[in-house]
């Protein structure tokens, strides 16, 4: 029964995650496996048997032969086989280890040493009482549009939002866009405000706070749901499906890079790991040269960064380190390698290992507990959750600085067809580097730089097994997620090209990323889960990807590593393995699909060097190694020249006056460190540019009166 439920869950995930044409290809692939000839074509010699008719369909082959076929796909020279193998392996393992059964538990967790939901949260909720709970200002600001249903207009009116009852303003807003099919329809709703902000993460939260506190009426659109701290389950599977973009399974078009992005109120700040870095000075100098903008080396930017640091209450110290961070620090110290303590937007004693699924204590400085909270307290903002922006509305600008003038946004409520037209003086798009370009392109903007120059900070992983007697207490999933890091330099290099850090580790992600070579081998890997330390190397990439749109308007993300970045990634893998060895791992490995496990105990230096040479020789061929990304930058670059950038030095698009971009997409290149503080600092500068423009418009309109 459990296997049947898991297969149904996997089939459901495939329907949600795959594009129609790819889903059809997978159906054909599976149909072929259900036939003898098809299995022979796809499985080759491994599908042959010694008994008549000498070859069988996949389901009737022995387990050994099935495993041979799967291993063959994983290491195939044909990229299509590797991609299919990776797809099924990752989804299957994730489903098996995140499935919640009766009682909120999974039958595999006890065997692998995993406790499930955060025990501290469970205990605190059992002991707490709802009596006397004060109203949360953010909760009062959020309007769940899908839940409001037919009463949405009344709910908006009660919240102080100006509702447009006349169809004429709706038609004017719709006709302002160059695309078709935007005319008003029955059931549509129109509202008016000063500024509409698309997105509630790093960029959107800062923008909303600055403008609302200045007295302007702000409407924030967020396609994801809002979760109160008391609603957060900290269960891996349900949390990813509710809070992550595309259920946590977003990837580049060829499946080569797995992408993590937030799709909830708070955006990426709700699910990130709290790491705070100031923008490195050498990066700021580089950005000045690339963009032609003085902003990045100005006093204005330094003051903005200082403001962000203060508002996030960034703490430079920690009370204690967990298993993974302790191993990273100890290994670096034994190698005399540089190692530092990560500053975090959380208290020094905040050691929640589940913060990647929202922070139940509310202590992490996500936008929900900082900037959005400030906007809510101003009483000048509302946030419409489960409301996705589909078009920016603009019209010809006969007397302005640019050809077109922003007029508002057309959005859709949840899965319904109900549309909301928001009329505004200014529009700020802060949907992130992966989602901002499609919105601009679908709205009719034509600047050729929109979507180009995407950087992903590609991440690769290494693991080491540390038995209980190794001297490091705890498990891989408990304690503060990120507290230590080590910079990686090129030979004779002055600045880091990558960082060695540790990831959040829970069974579903661990199982989906670990190499699979056989059922028995994978069972052993999972049995060691709680004492397996995973390190990650985050590369400052020079590769350039692109975000474009499919014929149906959906995002298409293309990204290919260049030779320089491939070499940097291999440097990161090598350093991570050496750190694990130095810290005392008894066995180590990578996430290369060959799945080699190297036994450190008893190995001499020659054995170790031979192993590292083998790892390097395998390289980072697409879909032969797991590559992830949680930092997305540069797809709508800021600059002084419209021929080389998508927005100007104020964050305003070159084509449309009053339309701004304020997220990681405006960064001129990869930053090389966790980008939250940098994105918010740039957003703070852009927010004051928007504010200055609004003040100017307000003064102009009052002067005419």
Each model region followed by its residue ranges:
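Rossmann-like flavin
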Residues: 63-66, 72-75, 79-86, 96, ...
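N-terminal FAD cofactor-binding segment of flavoenzymes
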Residues: 216-217, 223-282, 325-333
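FAD cofactor-binding and catalytic pocket of flavoenzymes
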Residues: 447-574, 578-580, 622-623, 629-634, ...
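Acidic/polar surface patches and capping/hinge elements
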Residues: 1-100
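Glycine-rich loop(s) and the adjacent beta-strand/alpha-helix scaffold that form part
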Residues: 210-236, 258, 264, 378, ...
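Conserved redox-cofactor binding core of oxidoreductases
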Residues: 108-172, 176, 294-396, 406, ...
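N-terminal Rossmann-like FAD-binding beta1-loop-alpha1 element of flavoenzymes
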Residues: 186-188, 192-220
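Extreme N-terminal leader/targeting segments of oxidoreductases
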Residues: 1-8, 12-19, 80-194, 692-705
